[in-house]
């Protein structure tokens, strides 16, 4: 049997997709990790149904010593835990050998953020007299006003947006729905774009996508990322400060800087775990520390 056809792994991934609705990229990464585990176990005269905690710890240690990054090691451990929990739950094993495995220590990475002045410069970069750039202006305004993920933004339909109520309906990770306020500025630019930009882009086509590409199709995340980089150059923003989610990060950090409650920011971002949102408090605290050092006479 070919290694990539391991039936236990495929059964597990099918169940995981049905239960958790994980992204295809995550499932593909899990598949690679788990096939590597099966290969290692086979080489050591074992398999998924007989592997011991010591086997799994040795496999994980070899991966880390071989240059696996902490993030990759954490993903590998997550895949292993979920697999063996599944095997135990399905009564294919009498135990869960991952129960006592130790997690690799992850360094805390602060999100790249922009100052409010940099965000203003970025948002003012598109030439709104050009329909394509008017669309981009509306997209940037919506992104900063709502903190949406880029994938959520490019997937918006006309029916997802209520300009009268000033809210957007978002289907996030795990098909979870949330309503996010737009704010007056974003509403204004969507209205402007709907009247003067979108008709030119769709060119008479029947299309429900709110922000189509210039070929009357749904825009890809990669295309919009290139647009962000283009406007960042015009705004004089260092590319080192950029990421596809740079305005999502700015949205969260600036809200916290202005006193927003952490749980409200969590709800707006669509985070299921508060700890995911808490990293933005470190960005805000770091900014305060820098300002203190710059301006306090005894800093």
Curated annotation (Swiss-Prot):
Pfam family, one: Phage_int_SAM_1
Domain Core-binding (CB), chain residue ranges per copy: 3-88
UniProt record, GO biological process: cell division; chromosome segregation; DNA recombination; DNA transposition; resolution of DNA recombination intermediates
Matches recorded under PROSITE patterns: CB (PS51900), TYR_RECOMBINASE (PS51898)
Annotated Gene Ontology cellular component terms: cytoplasm; Holliday junction resolvase complex
Molecular function per GO: DNA binding; tyrosine-based site-specific recombinase activity
Cellular compartment(s): Cytoplasm
Main location (coarse class): cytoplasm
Activity regulation information from UniProt: FtsK may regulate the catalytic switch between XerC and XerD in the heterotetrameric complex during the two steps of the recombination process.
UniProt xrefs under InterPro entries: CB, DNA_brk_join_enz, Integrase-like_cat_sf, Integrase_catalytic, Integrase_recombinase_N, Integrase_SAM-like_N, Recomb_XerD, Tyrosine_recombinase_XerC/XerD
Active site, UniProt feature: 149, 173, 245, 248, 271, 280
Domain Tyr recombinase: 109-293
Chain coiled-coil ranges: none
Functional note: Site-specific tyrosine recombinase, which acts by catalyzing the cutting and rejoining of the recombining DNA molecules. Binds cooperatively to specific DNA consensus sequences that are separated from XerC binding sites by a short central region, forming the heterotetrameric XerC-XerD complex that recombines DNA substrates. The complex is essential to convert dimers of the bacterial chromosome into monomers to permit their segregation at cell division. It also contributes to the segregational stability of plasmids. In the complex XerD specifically exchanges the bottom DNA strands.
Recorded family membership: Belongs to the 'phage' integrase family. XerD subfamily.
NCBIfam families listed in its UniProt record: PRK00283.1 (NF001399), recomb_XerD (TIGR02225)
Subunit structure: Forms a cyclic heterotetrameric complex composed of two molecules of XerC and two molecules of XerD, in which XerC interacts with XerD via its C-terminal region, XerD interacts with XerC via its C-terminal region and so on.
Protein name (record): Tyrosine recombinase XerD
